[in-house]
A protein has these predicted regions:
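Membrane-integral, polyisoprenol-dependent glycosyltransferases
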Residues: 2-446, 463-466
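Surface-exposed patches in mature extracellular/periplasmic domains of secreted proteins
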Residues: 62-65, 505-509, 531-534
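Solvent-exposed loop/turn segments at secondary-structure junctions
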Residues: 130-131, 240, 403-404, 515-516, ...
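Flexible, charged surface loops at secondary-structure boundaries
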Residues: 312-316, 498-505, 535-540
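Periplasmic/luminal catalytic loop of GT-C fold multi-pass membrane glycosyltransferases
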Residues: 324, 536-595
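Membrane-proximal, lumen/periplasm-facing interface regions of secretory-pathway glyco-
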Residues: 346-349, 445-507, 512-527, 572-605
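Short, hydrophobic beta-strand segments that form beta-sheet elements in well-ordered domains
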Residues: 509-513, 531, 544-546
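A short, well-structured beta->alpha microelement
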Residues: 523-538
Length: 606
């Protein structure tokens, strides 16, 4: 084959690679953004939405270690909501985008798990039912998983690359801009006041100034060893954001460190002899991870002044970002202290198994809905350790197994924690397919291709079923105390009667049920929506929402004179809500309150 033919073949391979990457990214994007509001917000999403609403409207958020997790979710979502509005689609989009970027980031591992391996891993991540489901949730998990992959890719590139690439420069610039964005918005709002045009004008001006400063910082970094330290600084930034996102960061980081040590030990103990190693090195292989060793990492750190500077810079980046977010951009000093206290609180929380599924919960859930990934990742781990050749594949396998074991041992279990180990499992599964397809054995090649196709088909169906059909079905593995789809019908009815009253969003709504999340989010624009969590005397409210069964007797006693019963709606498993409206607003189908426990007639409603 002459040089022209070689060049043509390379171009063809490059074209196939680019088209494949674009197609997989398109699938990931479609699955994460299509019908994003089809399922109502979960209880936790509603609480996160409440924190974000306060930050959006009042510019105030104070980190409290007793309230959910870290502050990053709210500040990242703030940028989205300022541009696209405080809407359900917007807040979920601010999470979904990181689900897509996880898939994109996987393409950069092609040197370490093979081209076919990285494409397959990315496809599995794009199609994983759990990855898609949690990407469509306004919670911390997906950004957390993205950061964990960001740490790995950054460190690998720091060891293996000599010069910073364009995308790493772009990511560094983005991190710097994000760090300053809330301050920009705050200053713009303060100077612009109630004038929207002025707010946008000041915001644009501040943004331009910050962009110039960021460009100067990037230029300075590029003059330092061709920008190679950028990768380590990115790893430090991702690590800091990881801890500022969720307390489980120490489990992820600890598992990664243990995995690195175990890979080194395994290769030392079970190192193949020189003849077999030479044969393995000469076999067809597009994986080039030979540089991923400690001496090369130590060399990349440099010595003398360079070593001191890169160490100090990494520590400063880590501390600055952590303090920045936990202190609510230097406005809440107690938040930094709370970041440390959070681990004592999390230790108590982690000692309870709310799902009552025992230590095998994740294996059970995984085999129910992520079986292709679980099985192929096990095969990939086996291949990696039998070969003892591909360091990154061994690391990914141990990373996956370590997290799986850690979360299985810890009593506290929720389905969304599983995606932390589904990520490295997809990498190991992709590696398994790569090794089979790259084999000289035609039967093994065919088997690898068939397994990839079967896995893709199974995952595609399960993803569709979970995310677009049975998204609130408690029999599904990832559905955990989720809000029932009937809840959206309740919100529609509240809006209908509020409009019918002529008062619209000024209508008075009394929520006396002790269970009401995520209703706070959906009624955020109703100025007189009150959440009492207990029965109160009401005389002038247009609408009342009460808890069925538990409050029925007292509801009938207190509200029968002025209110009628409309319908009962499921909030979540075991919790139903009754909708009452003032008699002058009620339709002909409304009932007296003493009749609200009568059986539903066929065709009468939900």
């Amino acid at each position: 084959m002459n040089e022209d033919e070689n060049r043509l073949e390379r171009r063809w391979h490059d074209l196939v690679w680019i088209v494949s990457c674009v197609a997989i990214t398109a699938v990931a994007t479609l699955l994460r953004f299509l019908y994003l509001t089809i399922k109502p917000l979960h209880h936790d999403e509603g609480v996160n939405g409440w924190f974000l609403t306060n930050l959006f409207r009042d510019g105030e958020y104070k980190y409290d270690p007793a309230n959910y997790h870290g502050p990053t979710l709210y500040y990242i979502s703030l940028g989205f909501t300022k541009v696209f509005g405080l809407e359900t689609y917007t807040i979920r989009s601010s999470v979904a985008v990181w689900g897509v970027l996880i898939v994109v980031l996987t393409f950069f591992l092609r040197r370490y798990i093979g081209k076919v391996g990285s494409l397959t891993a990315a496809l599995f991540l794009a199609l994983s039912p759990g990855m898609v489901y949690i990407s469509r949730y306004f919670i911390h998990e997906i950004f957390f998983v993205f950061l964990s992959l960001g740490i790995v890719v950054s460190v690998v590139f720091f060891i293996d690359k000599r010069r910073a690439g364009y995308l790493s420069i772009a990511w560094t610039a983005l991190v710097l801009l994000v760090c300053f964005l809330p301050s920009t918005l705050k200053f713009a709002s303060a100077l612009g006041g109630d004038n929207t045009t002025s707010v946008w004008a000041f915001g644009a001006a501040f943004f331009i100034v910050e962009a110039v400063l960021v460009a100067l910082v990037i230029r300075m970094l590029m003059s330092w060893n061709d920008g190679r330290p950028i990768y380590l600084l990115l790893a430090s930034a991702c690590l800091s954001l990881l801890f500022a996102t969720k307390e489980t960061a120490f489990i992820t980081v600890g598992t990664m460190m243990i995995a690195c040590v175990c890979v080194w030990i395994w290769r030392k103990i079970f190192k193949i002899d020189a003849t077999l190693e030479a044969a393995a090195e000469s076999s067809p292989d597009d994986i080039e991870d030979q540089r991923l060793i400690w001496p090369n990492f130590r060399e990349a750190l440099g010595s003398g002044t360079d070593l001191m500077l890169i160490t100090v810079a990494s520590v400063v980046v880590f501390l600055f970002i952590a303090v920045l977010f936990f202190s609510s951009f230097f406005t809440h000093a107690d938040g930094v202290k709370g970041a440390i206290e959070a681990y004592a609180i999390w230790t108590k929380t982690g000692s309870k198994d709310h799902t009552q599924n025992g230590p095998w919960a994740y294996l059970k859930w995984g085999m129910e809905i992520e079986a292709p990934i679980i099985l192929l990742s096990s095969l990939g781990i086996l291949i990696a350790f039998v070969k003892a050749k591909h360091r990154f594949a061994m690391f990914a396998g141990l990373w996956a197994f370590g997290l799986f074991a850690a979360y299985s041992i810890i009593p506290y279990k929720t389905p969304w924690l599983a995606i932390s180990f589904i990520l490295p499992m997809c990498l190991a599964a992709g590696y398994a397919i790569n090794e089979m397809v790259a084999s000289r054995n035609s039967s093994l090649k065919l088997t690898g291709g068939l397994l990839a196709l079967i896995a893709t088909a199974v995952l595609s169906y399960q993803t569709y079923d979970l995310n677009f059909v049975r998204h609130d079905d408690e029999d599904q593995a990832y559905v955990y105390a989720h809000t029932n789809r009937e809840f959206l019908a309740l919100m529609d009815q509240i809006e209908f009667y509020a409009d019918k009253s002529g008062r619209g969003q000024d209508a008075k709504i009394e929520v006396v049920s002790p269970d009401y999340w995520p209703m706070v989010w959906y009624l955020r624009n109703y100025k007189q929506a009150n959440f009492h969590a207990h029965l109160v005397d009401v005389s002038d409210a247009e609408i009342i929402v009460a808890k069925k069964t538990e409050q029925d007797a007292e509801v009938i006693k207190r509200y029968s004179a002025k209110y009628l019963y409309v319908e009962t709606y499921a909030l979540r498993p075991g919790v139903d809500l009754n909708l009452l409206v003032r008699k002058d607003l009620a339709d002909s189908g409304a009932k007296e309150l003493y009749r609200m426990n009568e059986p539903r007639m066929l065709g009468s409603g939900k």
